[in-house]
């Protein structure tokens, strides 16, 4: 689960501003530099979601769909645990987003508590997926309430489902994760969606939503792989087309590199991310040098005309 959750806004004039935050460790803090980089990526590059690597930490940020609040500048960020699955985090995002929108307030203390509860909810959800026993205990509590409310038929149905569905749910999630790790993305999607159906049967709607979102995300991976292959070829062509008379073409490298970084983040491909980040840094340096060369060329021309 994430180490921290941060709700912030980006003001067009003043930049990012933290609305609420909650950290599992007190010494964990999101720095102004990270928020500034998020602001640049969200606003200047118009990225809906993005990830940053800084000081051995991973930070994920995504724009919140807050039209119902008449706000178009709310963002939610997480500091990730080492080795944490980004696909799972993205799948949880929708649940957290909904809670924030439903309970949004100008009271900072209340919003901090809301983020704390959201993080606890994430932990509970992930524990349920790993331990069928926890789901069974939840079902028992729910059926007791149904019986107290006189809902005998519904209680019996839920009791019957609770006999084997939690184990079938856990087994299906395990299969889905194995398919995902082995890069069988279509099979993984099918298993995640099947697991979501099991979760709905026993009225675990948060788990169902999480698994459905994860299945849909994994289902996009084959297309992302095709896009990545196309971008790699496009990048190679741009570089091969650059010669001494067309140095300005270095500018064309940045956009496909940025997109390749985003795709690599989806696959948790840290080796490619490091290589692409280095390539971007060198390309940006080349762009600066070309700019300096053009300025020098212009000044040389002006001086020669005066001689």
Predicted regions and their residues:
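Acidic, low-complexity cytosolic segments
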Residues: 2-3, 13-142, 148-151
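Extended hydrophobic
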Residues: 8-9
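Extended amphipathic alpha-helical coiled-coil/heptad-repeat regions
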Residues: 127-307
């Amino acid at each position: 689960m994430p180490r921290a959750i941060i709700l912030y806004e980006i003001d067009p004039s003043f930049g990012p501003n933290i609305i609420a935050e909650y950290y599992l460790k007190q010494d964990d803090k999101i720095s102004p530099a990270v928020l500034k980089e998020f602001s640049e990526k969200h606003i200047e590059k118009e990225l809906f979601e993005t990830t940053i690597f800084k000081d051995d930490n991973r930070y994920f940020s995504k724009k919140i769909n807050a039209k119902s609040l008449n706000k178009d500048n709310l963002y939610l960020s997480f500091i990730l645990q080492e080795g944490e699955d980004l696909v799972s985090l993205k799948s949880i995002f929708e649940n957290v987003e909904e809670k924030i929108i439903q309970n949004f307030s100008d009271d900072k203390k209340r919003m901090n508590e809301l983020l704390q509860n959201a993080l606890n909810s994430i932990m509970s959800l992930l524990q349920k997926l790993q331990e069928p026993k926890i789901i069974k205990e939840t079902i028992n509590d729910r059926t007791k309430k149904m019986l107290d409310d006189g809902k005998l038929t519904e209680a019996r149905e839920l009791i019957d489902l609770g006999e084997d569905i939690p184990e079938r749910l856990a087994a299906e999630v395990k299969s889905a994760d194995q398919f995902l790790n082995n890069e069988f993305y279509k099979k993984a999607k099918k298993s995640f969606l099947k697991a979501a159906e099991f979760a709905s049967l026993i009225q675990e709607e948060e788990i169902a939503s999480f698994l459905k979102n994860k299945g849909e995300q994994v289902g996009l991976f084959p297309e992302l792989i095709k896009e990545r292959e196309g971008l790699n070829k496009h990048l190679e062509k741009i570089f091969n087309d650059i010669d001494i008379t067309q140095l300005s073409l270095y500018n064309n490298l940045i956009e496909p590199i940025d997109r390749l970084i985003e795709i690599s983040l989806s696959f948790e491909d840290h080796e490619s991310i490091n290589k692409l980040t280095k390539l971007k840094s060198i390309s940006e340096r080349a762009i600066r040098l070309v700019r300096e060369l053009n300025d020098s060329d212009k000044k040389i021309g002006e001086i020669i005309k005066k001689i």
